[in-house]
Amino acid sequence: MALLEIIHYPSKILRTISKEVVSFDAKLHQQLDDMHETMIASEGIGLAAIQVGLPLRMLIINLPREDGVQHKEDCLEIINPKFIETGGSMMYREGCLSVPGFYEEVERFEKVKIEYQNRFAEVKVLEASELLAVAIQHEIDHLNGVLFVDKLSILKRKKFEKELKELQKQQKHK
């Protein structure tokens, strides 16, 4: 396994529309394992392949259990996802490994139902609500070249751009 480099905003790579996965082989399995290791090392709960430079329609989500621990057996590997149903609306404070240090409220569907494939190309259906539904939507957005900051109001977007400039200034002075 290997730690992969996470691509940060404003890299144009994050705007790439990811392609369908067609080869469910050992290479894909290794990529998924490396993504998981990278996500855990970065203290994230979700990671889309494009965030590590792989323009493939795959993502992983590993929510912590009540004890706060993320168990690998709980990791969802979602490949070639498609929304079947969506419903409700909720606001959720989101962050992103590609936009480190910035968190903001984003409106999302409260419930989603998706069809996807696992690492063995088996078709699965998943119904999700609350945090899992939010994470699924956030990561699928990445597959379409969309970041959570794109969903902010103009006012919140300006706040984000200002904070980003401040952060970049601080990093230059280090």
From Swiss-Prot:
Keyword Signal: no
Coiled coil (residue ranges): none
Cofactor note: Binds 1 Fe(2+) ion.
Gene Ontology BP term (one): co-translational protein modification
InterPro entries, sorted: Peptide_deformylase, Peptide_deformylase_sf
Catalyses which reaction(s): N-terminal N-formyl-L-methionyl-[peptide] + H2O = N-terminal L-methionyl-[peptide] + formate
Active site (record annotation): 139
Keyword DNA damage: no
Binding site for Fe cation: 96, 138, 142
Class of this enzyme: hydrolase
One MF annotation (Gene Ontology) recorded for this entry: peptide deformylase activity
Keywords of this entry: Hydrolase, Iron, Metal-binding, Protein biosynthesis
Transmembrane segments: none
EC number in record: 3.5.1.88
Gene3D superfamilies registered for this protein in UniProt: Peptide deformylase
Highest taxon of the lineage: Bacteria
UniProt-listed HAMAP family: Pep_deformylase
NCBIfam families per the UniProt record, alphabetical: pept_deformyl (TIGR00079), PRK00150.1-3 (NF001159)
Job description of the protein: Removes the formyl group from the N-terminal Met of newly synthesized proteins. Requires at least a dipeptide for an efficient rate of reaction. N-terminal L-methionine is a prerequisite for activity but the enzyme has broad specificity at other positions.
Family: Belongs to the polypeptide deformylase family.
Name of the featured protein: Peptide deformylase
Source species of the chain: Helicobacter pylori (strain HPAG1)
Lineage: Bacteria, Pseudomonadati, Campylobacterota, Epsilonproteobacteria, Campylobacterales
